[in-house]
Amino acid sequence: MSTVIPKIALGAWSWGAGAAGGDQVFGNHLFEEELKPVFEKAMECGLNLWDTAAVYGEGTSERILGNFVKDVRRNSVILSTKFTPQIAGNSPDAMQKMIDVSKERLHTDVIDVYWIHNPMDAPKWTPDLIPLAKSGQIKTIGVSNHNLAEIKRANEILAAEGLKVSAVQNHYSLLHRSSERAGILDYCKENEITFYSYMVLEQGVLTGRYSEENPFPEGTGRG
């Protein structure tokens, strides 16, 4: 059963370290000591949808968020995480194994929003969301980094079992408007799908933090 999800999510991509972590991607060094006040202030302001992924920081992002979640009422926070095909392996229960690890890190039995992180072999993986939804392990299904045809295909697969894509998360900003030009925003509006933009400020480029004179830290993925 789909849950009502807010229009604003707070991302935890840059939390923690390691491959796909904040240090290697952005040059950040953000751990629990720095992030706990951010979590507490956001929750105080009513911002309670937290978005992470199994791959972020090789799991450290989920672990940090999970440690914060332990200190609040579970129904006061909405947890969003992702199945990343590239680290899944080939076992028939790969998605179940990945979500089990995510649930353990996040200290929860239920994931409020569960995404297929990118479209690599998405038609193969999308059907595996169905038993997770029907068993109550996930409440809402999302797809990330999918083009319009891939979103429609995911919806077709899910619709056969009475389910649907309820959220799309793509790179979108004033500098990167492919989802708009491709008709994804219109499709989401027409089908009551919540669209989430990530990198909406281009990690500080649009706020003036980074420029040719002040680039991302050398050696990082963004640099």
Range-by-range predicted roles:
Residues 1-77:
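N-terminal binding-site loop/beta-alpha segment at the start of enzyme catalytic domains
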Residues 2-5, 44, 66-76, 100-107, ...:
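Acidic (Asp/Glu)-rich catalytic clusters
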Residues 10, 35, 42, 50, ...:
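Conserved, mostly hydrophobic/aromatic
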Residues 17-23, 85-90, 206:
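A short acidic, helix-capping loop that chelates divalent metal ions and anchors anionic groups
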Residues 27-42, 89-107, 122-127, 148-155:
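Short, acidic/polar
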Residues 53-62, 86-91, 117-124, 148-149, ...:
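Acidic-and-aromatic substrate-binding clefts and catalytic sites of carbohydrate-active enzymes
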Residues 75-87, 114-117, 169-172:
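A short, structured active-site edge motif that brings together acidic residues
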Residues 119-223:
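Beta/alpha (TIM)-barrel catalytic core signal, keyed to glycine-rich beta->alpha loops juxtaposed to Asp/Glu
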